[in-house]
Amino acid sequence: MSSRIEGIGRPRVEPSFVPDVIDEMLQVPDAGSLAAIRLLRQRTGHWAGGSTGTNLYGAFRLIARMLEEGHAGSVVTLLCDGGERYANTYYNDEWLVEQNLDIEPYAAKFEHFLNSGKFSVPDD
């Protein structure tokens, strides 16, 4: 199945994509993206869409790796999309069950990351 995150997993590459500026790409599970936006909402009150969750997931992994390797620096990501229009999907527990998405393992990993700086990917 392709991604349930809008705009991710499309068969075409957007004209604005500039591969020369990409340092690294990683696969992010849909459940991880959705756990990230729910964490953002819980911590900040900000509604964000799934692609923002994908960015947060990647940023958390990068920060954890930097800490583990002793690297200092800044990590910047974008809050790409508002999430209000996803109230009946990404933010709806019944929808998650219908889609067979379990965000709890990711939510637990994010809490652990925020408390320790260590992030490990749950087994899928």
Predicted regions and their residues:
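Buried hydrophobic packing segments
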Residues: 37, 55-63
